Regions:
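Residue-level recognition of well-ordered beta-strand positions that form the cores
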Residues: 434, 489-491, 501, 520-522, ...
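Beta-strand/loop nucleic-acid-binding surfaces
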Residues: 493-511
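Histidine/acidic-residue-rich, glycine-tolerant segments that coordinate divalent metal ions
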Residues: 112, 119-172
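Short alpha-helices
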Residues: 73, 150-191, 197-209
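Short beta-strand micro-motifs in enzyme catalytic cores
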Residues: 364, 397, 484-488, 532-534
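OB-fold single-stranded nucleic acid-binding module
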Residues: 405-411, 513-542
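Hydrophobic helix-and-loop "lid/oligomerization" segment in the mid-to-C-terminal part
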Residues: 2-115, 135, 187-411, 418-425, ...
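Accessory interdomain/linker segments of ATP-dependent helicases and helicase-like nucleic-acid enzymes
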Residues: 437-498
Length: 542
């Protein structure tokens, strides 16, 4: 069995048929009937009425990439279906905040809306939808987030998370649900012939990867074929953004979406308004697309600078909290749109759950990141009597509280951690190898080419990790302006050497020549000045 076959087997792909199905995703075979989703028939019927009567439709999106992608999908498709009046509203993180709000509904009314179609939001917005109804505005909800026991008072609520339906795949993202609405409308309206909806898959892929939903079933096929659409550069905005980000279209993969396009789009909503990102997605000519993309690049550079500044300040606080099991850091000058990213970086550095809180006068808003058996959402609930509001899930949560209660909150979440009597939580942060190897004999370009066939990588289909059980450090080289990166050369038992690279490496990666180590890594190809060499992306050393 080759190393590649061992990796596939480690993923449960042990038969030829299973491997074939996985490595060659079939769009048609997982194009599930959209009418199996709850309320899809009601949604289509209401949209047919709007189409026939020329009503004004406002697509109400979310400011994250999934919401923006879903908004762009419906703007594109509704235009082809011939809807006469269609607009979009993206809430501002710093003005309206997350989800539907009463103030946002007023703004949508002022846009002349007869019908709101939500994307990536709405399932829990009962009061806001009721308010829109009192203004004579109907609402069709399309969403994928968790739901309440009772559905919202909308004309339709299309969400695979609702119980009691027969749709076979529940982990669609907001863009995926919007795409199902398009597929359903294709059966009732002219303008977008069957098969032509596939040109929307670049947007579906963007939302799916960046919202970190499971890359299985329909999601895997949508992203696989969405990347093929993206390579053809049919959308001026994404073509320009790839150029600005230095991404070669013919080589674009899921990693480029998550770490190249995604951060640039998110920077707009984190610092100013996500409308800039929507302008890029919907740009109709090259100049407009380039201007929008350059604006996103400018904001992303600014975002990185702000993020680095907050991270440094947070580290100064965290360094004085060595006895705390949960880090709670706070300041009155931290940008609320960036603190979530910083929380993730703090978890990576300190190997502890983190709450990072930005004060705004008497009130403070925080973002949490956690891992293992310590649920961020449960920690928030444990402080229910201290906070104003909060919620989330195991790995991430948000909280709003009075600024004067931050110290009380810090004590409470640490007491909650202690009450759980958790052991060895940092082990959850270590990489887990798909396969252990005892030499580098099969780490070559053929393996790299085969691993590329497993794309797209993401949640539920992580990039494969290998562990070399015994190797000797042959060379150590510090790199970067501050010596923060490391390039190690490791030698196996057969004297075969492989270079491994780690950016912003922890100090324990800087080993001595002659050290015996085990290394967890991902095989990659380094291309430099026309030369290709196989190396490893170093993840962990022991």
């Amino acid at each position: 069995m080759t190393l590649f076959e061992k990796i596939l087997a480690a993923r449960g792909l042990t038969t030829r048929a299973a491997c074939e199905e996985f490595l060659n995703p079939n769009y048609a075979s997982v194009k599930h009937d959209p009418f199996l989703l709850p309320d899809m028939k009601k949604a289509v019927d209401r949209l047919k009425k709007a189409h026939a009567e020329g009503e004004k439709i406002v697509i109400y999106g979310d400011y994250d990439i999934d919401g923006l992608s879903a908004t762009a999908i419906l703007l594109d498709a509704f235009g082809k279906f011939g809807f006469k009046e269609v607009g979009a509203f993206i809430p501002n993180r710093f003005v309206e905040g997350y989800g539907m709000t009463m103030g946002a509904v007023d703004k949508v009314r002022n846009m002349g809306a007869d019908l709101i179609v939500t994307v990536d939001t709405g399932s829990l917005c009962h009061a806001e939808i009721e308010y829109a109804s009192s203004l004579g505005i109907d609402t069709v909800v399309t969403d994928h987030h968790n739901v309440a026991e009772t559905p919202p008072p909308s004309v339709a609520a299309v969400n695979p998370k609702f119980p009691g339906h027969k749709y076979p795949f529940r982990d669609l993202c907001g863009a995926g649900v919007a795409f199902k609405l398009v597929q359903a409308l294709q059966t009732e309206l002219d303008g977008l012939p069957d098969g032509y909806e596939k040109w929307l898959l670049d947007l579906v892929a963007l939302g799916t990867v960046c919202d970190i939903v499971t890359l299985a079933d329909e999601n895997r096929a949508n992203v696989y074929w969405g990347l093929e659409v993206l390579k053809k550069q049919r959308r001026p905005g994404l073509k320009a953004l790839m150029s600005v980000a230095g991404i070669e279209p013919e080589k674009v993969n899921a990693r480029h979406l998550g770490f190249g396009l995604g951060p640039r789009m998110n920077a707009a909503g984190r610092l100013e308004t996500a409308q800039y990102a929507l302008d890029m997605l919907t740009a109709s000519d090259g100049l407009e697309a380039l201007e929008a993309s350059e604006k996103l690049e400018e904001l992303n550079i600014k975002r990185r600078s702000i993020q680095d500044e907050i991270f440094d300040e947070a580290c100064q606080q965290a360094d004085n909290m060595t006895d705390d099991r949960v880090l709670v850091v706070n300041s009155d000058n931290w940008n609320h749109g960036v603190i979530g990213i910083v929380a993730s970086k703090l978890v990576e550095k300190y190997k502890k759950p983190v709450f990072i809180i930005g004060e705004r006068g008497d009130e403070a808003t925080g973002s949490a990141r956690s891992f293992g058996d310590f649920s961020a959402a449960d920690a928030v609930r444990a402080a229910d009597d201290i906070i104003i509001k909060g919620g989330g899930h195991g790995a991430a949560a948000g909280v709003t509280l009075a600024t004067e209660r931050i110290d009380d909150f810090r004590r409470r979440v640490n007491e909650f951690y202690d009450s759980l009597q958790l052991k060895n939580q940092e082990l959850y942060l270590l990489p887990r190898a798909d396969v252990e190897i005892d030499d580098f004999s099969e780490i070559n370009e053929e393996l790299i080419d085969n691993l590329a066939k497993m794309e797209p990588f993401g949640n539920g289909n992580a990039e494969p990790i290998l562990k070399i059980t015994e190797a000797t450090v042959l060379n150590v080289r510090r790199m970067g302006a501050d010596g923060q990166h490391v390039k190690l050369t490791l030698r196996d038992k057969n004297d075969v050497a492989l270079q491994m690279l780690a950016f912003n490496a922890p100090e324990e990666f800087f080993r001595e020549v002659g050290d015996e180590v085990s290394a967890w890594f991902q095989p990659t190809v380094n291309e430099w000045q026309g030369m290709r060499s196989v190396e490893g992306r170093l993840l962990h050393l022991a």
